[in-house]
A protein has these predicted regions:
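Active-site charged/polar residues at nucleotide-handling catalytic sites that mediate phosphoryl
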Residues: 73
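Short Gly/Thr/Asp-enriched flexible loops that form oxyanion-binding sites at enzyme active sites
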Residues: 88-102
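Conserved mixed alpha/beta catalytic, RNA-binding, or beta-rich assembly cores of soluble enzyme
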Residues: 1-70, 84, 90, 105, ...
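Structural motif
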Residues: 3, 76-77
Length: 147
């Protein structure tokens, strides 16, 4: 039996509203990275956590602490979500930190099938992430009305 955890990109989940629905669908259907498990092997999803965010000097340490929340419940493999695979320039650093801190846990990069190329995905995410938006400052300065 494989006991899995998924780490999602906090920018994708918190700022862009990703609900991990594609990751979970492919987990259930054994597609994408989950297709690497034998059909006869039972898969259990122990939990999903978000990355602590784009790093400062403590980024890898913060991620290691978050992963402890899964290791305490017997996770044996951590999957970095497709968002991390396609978007994160720090994924290899994070992967190394987890492998060093948890040598008995396998770290895999990827979850669901790729629906577009990673480059196209990055461009599309950048477009929605960088849209101008209104903030509380606009309300305070009375700039929140259209026109």
């Amino acid at each position: 039996m494989a006991r899995l955890g998924i780490v999602t990109c906090s920018n994708a989940t918190q700022d862009l509203g990703c609900s991990s629905v594609s990751c979970l669908a492919d987990f259930r259907k054994r597609k994408g990275a989950f297709g690497e498990y034998a059909e006869s092997e039972k898969l259990t999803l122990v939990g999903i956590i978000s990355c602590p965010g784009c790093p400062t000097l403590t980024g890898p340490d913060k991620l290691v602490e978050r992963i402890r929340a899964l290791t305490e419940f017997g996770v044996d493999t951590i999957h970095f979500s497709y968002c991390i695979k396609a978007l994160c320039p720090f994924k290899e650093k994070y992967k190394s930190a987890l492998e060093q801190s948890f040598p008995s846990i396998k770290v895999m990069v990827g979850t669901h099938e790729e629906h577009v190329t990673p480059e196209e995905f990055r461009q599309r995410v950048k477009k929605i992430f960088c849209q101008p938006r209104k903030t509380m400052v606009d309300i305070i300065l009375n700039k929140d009305e259209d026109g």
